Amino acid sequence: MSIITMVWLMKVFVFVTLLSLVFVITESAPESALITKLPGFEGTFPSKHYSGYVTIDKEHGKNLWYYFIESEKNPSKDPVVLWLNGGPGCSSMDGFVYEHGPFNFELPKKNNSLPLLHLNPYSWSKVSNIIYLDSPVGVGFSYSNNKSDYITGDIKTAVDSHAFLLKWFQMFPEFQSNPFFISGESYAGVYVPTLASEVVIGNKNGVKPALNFKGYLVGNGVADPKFDGNAFVPFAHGMGLISDELFENVTKACKGNFYEIEGLECEEQYTKVNDDTNQLNIYNILEPCYHGTSLSAFDIRSLPSSLLQLGKTEKRLPIRKRMFGRAWPVRAPVHPGIVPSWSQLLADVTVPCIDDRVATAWLNDPEIRKAIHTKEESEIGRWELCSGKLSFYHDAGSMIDFHRNLTLSGYRALIYSGDHDMCVPFTGSEAWTKSLGYKVIDEWRAWISNDQVAGYTQGYANNLTFLTIKGAGHTVPEYKPREALDFYSRFLEGSKI
């Protein structure tokens, strides 16, 4: 080979290399979505933050809003995790503010001041890239110019979220090869497996970009009407909240069926169970309740508008209060049809045990909304923890077959439960995971965090793990942040929990 030829080849190599570098630089996260500062936080973010809208239907002006945090560890290699709060209708910024986001929020010392933000040592962004998505449209900062889009359900939500993911990974192509997981809690027990199934079908059908989907996590999630409905009474008895005598009476009167309360004697005994547990915090029976003083004009404005309208159930108020929760309903949503919201259930009664003042104040501040690239309040309204805009239909049925199909297809699943949650008790999740009939490959045992027993776990064939977190409530990382980060990290790594 002549020297001239070698020089020419070298020039071609350099040109191609430079061109590829330019391609990598240009085909990356949109700089317009970068968050450079947040009022209330002093210092430097430990990793990059992005937020903004993804339009999934231009004709309708249908836009889903996200907040994305790169991993503080190794963003180019660490998994990408989508986080979904439940409801249906609750913003995933609930998880950002109160559970596993990058900041801890300190209440301001002065009225009308913004909360102070401190770095959260147990943020899930320590070990993963994480997307907080307001879904479905009409929730949080997500909106549509066509109000008919606020009439939706399980299947449409899964289709829309899949459309979001495809466009998001096109906007952030550098993460397309990273392992991808879907996670969520409460009614996201429906969102997660239905969306996961959409992703799997899309990949099989050659939809691009292909998502490197590996598995999913569900925390205290609804799954099936019978298993969820029958979980409460055994939980209350096991926790010592009702007497042996009452447990025997209600079991006999209802013939062990607490999913459908039938007959006067069954209803009377079941009401006694509710009377004994009615004053407890349903999200964590060890915690006190936050009680609103009254529905003053200010209180009404601070609550989701959905709380001010509905109430269509024949169940007595104590039963209604137990059935439905912050990331809400337990039994009602697993029946086919419209899912009632808090306002439908409680009428003029305040939501029990919930204090969302920090998130509401922070996310409705004009400077914060500007910093995180949301539409102004004058355009899309106030941010609400749980939206009243939706007419939401449960149309996906039981989640049991979704879980079976996903795990038999080789996808990893972690079903975790705070063991003091009375909203979606661990007894139901334990029962339905067992009902799949998979071989036990890791016998029931304690799992350890910080040299202490953090809960119990049982592993099954086909990549399924059931896990409890000792002392945690409905929103596990809110109560046990260190332990939550531990099991989350181990699961993503594929390590034994």
UniProtKB/Swiss-Prot annotation:
Subcellular localization: Secreted
GO cellular component, one term: extracellular region
Tissue expression profile of the protein: Ubiquitous.
Top EC category: hydrolase
Entry superkingdom: Eukaryota
Sugar-bearing residue positions: N111, N146, N249, N405, N463
UniProt keyword annotation of Hydrolase present: yes
Function of the protein: Probable carboxypeptidase.
Name of protein: Serine carboxypeptidase-like 20
Organism this protein belongs to: Arabidopsis thaliana (Mouse-ear cress)
